[in-house]
Amino acid sequence: RNRKMVVLIEQIEIPASYEKMEAWTANFEEEFVKWSPYHIECNLYNGNYHAGSKVRFREIVMGLDYDVTGTITECEQDENHFRIVFRSDKKTAFITFEGKRTETGCHFSHTEAFGMTTPVIGAFMNFLIFKVFFRKKANWQLIRDDMILDNRYLYDILTEGKYPERIPLDKLLTGAK
């Protein structure tokens, strides 16, 4: 993308078969909500996650309500690897999920990139977006911690079939902004 974007990458090795990760991905609309107690909704408006498909994610992390709609811009998949890239409708966030088969199981990579890619005005707009308008939601450490937690949850899901305990929605929504 562009060096002015903020890019966060978290990766994890999981000693589970690639087929388990592939099955998890194939059922993403349902699995997204079960993946983390902070994930509230996932809608694949076209019923799939192919390039061009419309998607909505909603999660509440530390009282911040992230409700994002966008489009899958890339979707590659074969028997050893998958890569799915999502771009928000505002074109200020890109989320990439990538999985691959390894000798000991599978590898999962979760990348979140934020900012405008437009040359010249991109830097100014990023300043306005991150420092002025969405200062609270542009908490990079909070987002990174959530990504790390998501990876730990995925490890447990794929190795033990163990999902995290749900947090009641009213508790998550208390004081959410």
Q: Model segments located where?
A:
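Glycine-rich portal/gate segments that line the openings of hydrophobic small-molecule binding cavities
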Residues: 43-94, 104, 145-162, 172-176
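Extended beta-strand/beta-hairpin segments
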Residues: 7, 161-168
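Well-ordered beta-strand positions in beta-sheet-rich domains
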Residues: 9-11, 67-69, 94-96, 111
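Short amphipathic alpha-helical segments
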Residues: 17-24, 142-146, 150
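Beta-strand/loop substructures that line and gate deep hydrophobic ligand-binding cavities in soluble
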Residues: 87-145
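Hydrophobic ligand-binding cavity/cleft-lining segments
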Residues: 2-50, 173-177
